[in-house]
Each structure stands twice: as structure tokens, then as C-alpha cells.
Amino acid sequence: MSQLYRIILGCIFSLLFIVIPAKAQKEAEVYNVDSSLYAYYQRCQENLLEPVVLSMSDTLFHMAAEQNDQRMQAVALSTRLDYYYYQGNNEDSVVFHTSKVKQFAKETLQPKYYYFAWANRLILYYLKTGRSNIALYEAEKMLKEAQEEDNKTGLLYCYNIMSQIYTIKNFDVMASEWRQKEIELTEKYKLENYNISNTYAQLASYYTTHHQPELAVKALEKAVRTANSASHKILAKLAY
């Protein structure tokens, strides 16, 4: 990165707390978070693959603490975990920072971040590095804990990660059963599930492969209807 580029970035960064872009302001209102915190969070995301995000995430954590925003503190800790997760070559750091996120989330009663870190970072890390058996072991521990607590958010993450594990293992029937569990839980309790569209699309693909066209069409219709992003819409259309 050139010196000039660093200077330009520094100038832009210094203006963040003076001029908040309209889009960021609107998104901050939607997510019910202070606009300056949200703007700085966006900067963290822009630098997610760079080592500088480690110090930036610390800053975000302390900024959030000053405003007594425990949710954004959890986001800050998760951002640091994200850096190591996407590096893909530092397992000890992934394990350590997963534990940090889980501990903070448990202490502040934020199951969303607790189970996200466990499922979508630690367990997915094991899957990405070809260790599906270790991933399954962790997922079974997570499932047991979520069941004991009757934590619907935790169960949602468990069902989703179980479907991914069994897909990797080429156990398509079992994978589809876990996807169906995820869908039923989401619909029954009207849970927040940003990627539910992908689950419908994957289930539709299973139905198509197993010559169940009517079920496939219904799942695809729901995939399109619940799409929350352009990538969701693309996956749903590809499943047709």
C-alpha cells in the first residue's frame, strides 16, 4: 500500500465523525445503532482482511463500551475473530477468539453472537480445512447445549451447520432432514434467519435430484420470496 494511499485513507477516516454518509446514517437508524459507531464498523469491514483491523476492532469495542452498547461490543469481538477466520492459517487464534466472543456473549445474554461464533466461525473453519469429523464433534456439543437451554437461536445455528456438515460428508438425506428442521423452526417461531433463502434453495435442489418436482417448486418459490440479498436471489434462480 503506497504512502499516498495511506494518507488519503487517513484523511477519509478523520472525516468519518464529521460527515456521515446518508446511506450509513439510514442503515444506522435501521439497525438502531449510533451513527458514528456504525460508520466506524463499516471502516472495519472495509479493512477486514488487513492486520490493521485488529487495532480497529479494539477501538470499536471501546467506543461501544463508552456508549454502553453491548451488541456493538460483541460485533467488535466478532470482527477480530473474522480476521483470523478469513486468514485461514491460524487455528489457535480462531479457537481463542471464538472463546472470547462466546464468553462475552454469554455474559451479556447475546445468544446470536455466541452461537454464530461457534457454528459459523469455529465449526466452519474445521470444515474449510477438511476436518469434518472434528466439525461434527463440535456441532454435537453445540446442539446438546442449545437443547438443554431450549435456545431457539442456538438450535437454528445447530440445524444449519449440521446440514452443511452432512453435505460435505455426502449424506444428502441427512443434510436435507437438518435443513427441514431449520426451516420448520424458523417458520414456527418466526425467527430471524438472514440466510433462510439459501436453505430453501438447497432443499429445492435436493428435491429436484430425488425427483420430487412439486416440493422443489414450492421450496424455490419460498427461496425467492425470502431472499435478502442479490446473492440469495442468484442462488435461488440457479436452483431452478
Task: Indicate where each model-derived feature is located.
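Compositionally biased, low-complexity segments enriched in small residues
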Residues: 3-4, 19, 221-222
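Bacterial N-terminal signal peptides
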Residues: 9-18
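Bacterial N-terminal signal peptides that target proteins for export
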Residues: 1-9
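A "functional boundary" signal
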Residues: 22-240
